Amino acid sequence: MGTMPKDMMDFWFGDTVNKGGLDARTRLLLTLAGLTMQGAQNDMALRQTVRHAREAGATKQHIVETISQMSVFAGLPAMTRALELAQSVLDEEKDTKKEDGA
């Protein structure tokens, strides 16, 4: 599954609505934290959020730290599930780069 076009990302997660506010990467990491807090129950939403966060400049470390921080509040099962889903996206990303010859 792909990601939304850049102009939509900028509108929904950038500073189009709130000039001088949070950048897209931060908004998406907060969204990822919220999805983890809900128990990482919505696989598709969590995976899409990881993809969008990566496109917005989040590193693997940003994603792992965001999810791990939520273990304090959401518990280890939610953190583990979210990390598994995030890792599957990162693995797909790695496989795509191999296929593209990068």
Predicted regions and their residues:
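Acidic, glycine/proline-rich low-complexity segments that act as flexible tails and inter-domain linkers
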Residues: M1-L28, M37, E55, M79-A102
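N-terminal alpha-helical segment
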Residues: M9, L29, A45-L46, I63
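Amphipathic alpha-helical segments within well-ordered protein domains
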Residues: G14-V17, G34, V50-R54, V64-S68
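Alpha-helical scaffolds flanking conserved acidic
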Residues: D23-L29, K60-E65
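Contiguous, well-ordered alpha-helical segments that form the cores/surfaces of helical PPI scaffolds
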Residues: L28-Q38, S68-Q69
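Short alpha-helix boundary/capping elements
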Residues: G34-N42, A58, A74-G75
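Extended intrinsically disordered, low-complexity coil regions enriched in Ser, Thr, Gly, Ala
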Residues: N42-Q61, R81-V89
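Substrate/cofactor-recognition hotspot
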Residues: Q69, L76-P77
